[in-house]
């Protein structure tokens, strides 16, 4: 069993529970990603965890995979990179949004669900979520319906 973690304390708890591997969700990962730079994160976790470590977050090329392995990860974990494949069933509009977005379009906010996550600015805007809203902590008022 592999368990995803965003902090060292989560990795320690998962390790004590006997997991087979850890997926380190570092800064830049899509969705509910972590905020820790992958270099110190891998080093910290590798100091006590000797089983399989996967690194996720901002990995989209062979060079990124090689870097993850050089830093001490056993494997790399990619998700967003595969959304734009022909095999993906994602809508073309969504695929285009990913291709046309820049690093500056990544917004880390807890305003959507109360739990911090990375979103692409165009997707927030498409849902009617403004910068004023995503800058606030808490939940968005979706109304009474």
Q: Which positions does each model-derived feature cover?
A:
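Conserved active-site-proximal phosphate/metal-binding subdomains
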Residues: 16, 35-54, 60-145
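Active-site entrance/lid segments in N-terminal catalytic domains of soluble metabolic enzymes
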Residues: 1-52
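Short loop or secondary-structure boundary microenvironments that flank
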Residues: 28, 57-58
């Amino acid at each position: 069993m592999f368990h995803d973690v965003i902090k060292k304390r989560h990795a320690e708890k998962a390790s004590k529970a006997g997991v087979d591997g850890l997926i380190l969700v570092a800064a830049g990962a899509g969705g509910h990603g972590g905020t820790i730079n992958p270099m110190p994160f891998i080093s910290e976790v590798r100091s006590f965890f000797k089983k399989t470590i996967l690194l996720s977050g901002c990995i989209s090329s062979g060079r990124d995979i090689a870097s993850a392995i050089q830093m001490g990860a056993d494997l790399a974990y990619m998700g967003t990179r595969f959304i734009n494949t022909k095999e993906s069933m994602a809508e073309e509009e969504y695929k285009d949004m990913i291709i046309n977005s820049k690093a500056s379009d990544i917004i880390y906010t807890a305003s959507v669900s109360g739990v911090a996550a990375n979103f692409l600015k165009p997707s927030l805007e498409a849902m009617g979520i403004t910068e004023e809203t995503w800058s606030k902590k808490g939940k968005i008022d979706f109304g009474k319906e």
